[in-house]
Amino acid sequence: MRKSLFLLVGAFCLALAAKATPKYIFLFIGDGMGMGHVMATETYNRLVLNNDENILMMQFPVASMAMTYSANSPVTDSAAAGTALATGHKTKNSMIGMTPDSVAVNSIATELKAQGYGVGLVTAVAYDDATPAAFYAHQTNRGMYEEINADGAKCGFNFLGGAGTHVAEKSKEKAEQIFDNYRANGFTVVNGLDELNKANAGEKVLFTSNTAVTPNEIGYTIDSISGALTLQQLTTACLDHLKKVSPDKFFMMVEGGNIDHAAHGNDGGAVVKEVHNFNKCIRVAYDFYLQHPEETLIIITADHDTGGMTVGVSNGPKNITLKEMDCQKISKEQFNDFCSRNGDFTWEQMKEAMSEKLGFWTRIGINQEEEARMKESFDHMKAHDDRTQKTLYKEYWSFTAIVFDILNHKYGIGFTTTSHTGNPVPVFAIGEGSEQFKDLNNNIEIPQKIRKLTNLD
């Protein structure tokens, strides 16, 4: 009798252990996506799109936060934060896949691959950018792109995808040599969805976009670039590939990299449209979860907060609706490039362009003081003595910075910096084992909990 009872208890425990092991794991990382970015998007979703339901991530049953400090700073960079989320180890800013004393540490993706999981990583920026690189590379500096790609070629993952490689920003010839190395290590290298669909791809794919604005950017959602690859399409392509080559179990990381780029530029409208698009990518995984609810885990978080974005500003609109946001038809980056291309514009021509692209004077009221401020800076820009606003990814005319400062103020959106902050970031989860993420997390705990759930620890 006692023996039978022990056997029954043992069988029950084994059943619980088996049930607690997710087979399909999705980790979504909104680069730079603080709670302010999420709430601005939720406000837009509710007041402009008139949706009664919250954005999908905010519907998940687990909602928590994570601290993001690095080993050497209260304010992390993407390399240290990516390493924390990938490996469960704190490191110094700029370091990839290593401890502060330069000891290489494996990511959960590498460990899961060794246990037979398929692995896919996709991003809206370069596939060798800091966050995705932290899952496969081990380098002392995030800018060591050739070395990062050497690690990538040997990682054995099933899908790496993004806008392109940072190496191509300096040398297309070196980029081709890097692609050849991936091919030599068994990857099928494709440029665009058409090539992917036509290729008889093997188990490993390196995907780059043939419509990318730069090798580090597929393009902003707000710019509505005709025919441009979207992160939602890339997420679907990666998922389809994993279902084909590793149908029994896989791990997938999706990074919304353009959220960070837009936030560095303090482009409130672009941030909201990027987070809204990121939510569509989450929907791809959620639809899969609905088919496999007892086997799937979805986690959503961010590597850090960029910009310190807020809904509400000093002396801003008393009744924030964000309805003006749909007047914005161009990102701050593209508007800046537009200004550079049209240096011969008169002020009246620029006013007409701002009316068309931003809604100024037509749908968004501009007072005399605001117009005078913009015109003064516009005149300096035409005379080439305009000061510039420098951020991590872009250098803007002061005129552009002033225009978008006024635009954000009209929205009721504020920013505290063009850099990162030390603010905690949101954590949302649903599915098998999601309850593990319900308490306040340190970012290193997220991969540690995935290890525990998959019996890697």
Regions inferred by a protein language model and the residue ranges of each:
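Glycine/charged-rich beta-loop-alpha catalytic/anionic-binding loops adjacent to active sites
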Residues: 92-94, 263
